[in-house]
Design a protein with these regions (language model features):
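Catalytic loop of short-chain dehydrogenase/reductase
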Residues: 22-47, 52-61, 74-75
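Short C-terminal tail/terminal secondary-structure segment
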Residues: 113, 120-142
Length: 142
């Protein structure tokens, strides 16, 4: 909670509320929408979503800036390599993920770019970028 929420708030309050700001984007998690994973992790990411909604109102009113959160599911990174290498676990994950894969880092970067550089109107939204994991929350396996 300290890293995912408290420090996110501290950094945002210090740097986001400026005249030149056009977009603020938070890194939430599909766990913020489903409650899955560890309780403190899910709660901290849900807190980020709630804080984002508050910031979206303030940033729009004062600076006409957008503010959103991306709620990623699994992303193929080095950090998650042990999950992918565990064949039985990976099969269970793919079985309950509608798109039958995780996002690549490049796909995550595309979303980040779109939401910060192209988007000019969507604000206050927690966007599910999970390959459908949210729809299978009761089947969470890892």
């Amino acid at each position: 909670i300290k890293v995912n929420l408290i420090r996110t708030i501290a950094v945002t309050e210090k740097y986001a509320f400026q005249k030149k700001i056009k977009s603020v984007l938070f890194n939430a998690s599909v766990s913020a929408l489903t409650g899955n994973e560890f309780a403190s992790y899910a709660a901290s990411k849900a807190g980020v979503v709630g804080y984002m909604k508050n910031c979206a109102i303030r940033l729009a009113n004062e600076y006409r800036a957008t503010c959103n959160a991306l709620c990623f599911g699994g992303i193929l990174t080095e950090l998650n390599e042990p999950v992918v290498q565990n064949k039985s676990l990976w099969k269970k994950i793919l079985d309950v993920t509608p798109l039958k894969r995780w996002a690549t880092a490049e796909e995550a970067a595309d979303w980040i770019y779109f939401m910060t550089a192209i988007n000019k109107f969507c604000t206050g939204q927690a966007i599910d970028v999970s390959g459908g994991e949210r729809n299978c929350a009761d089947l969470f396996v890892w």
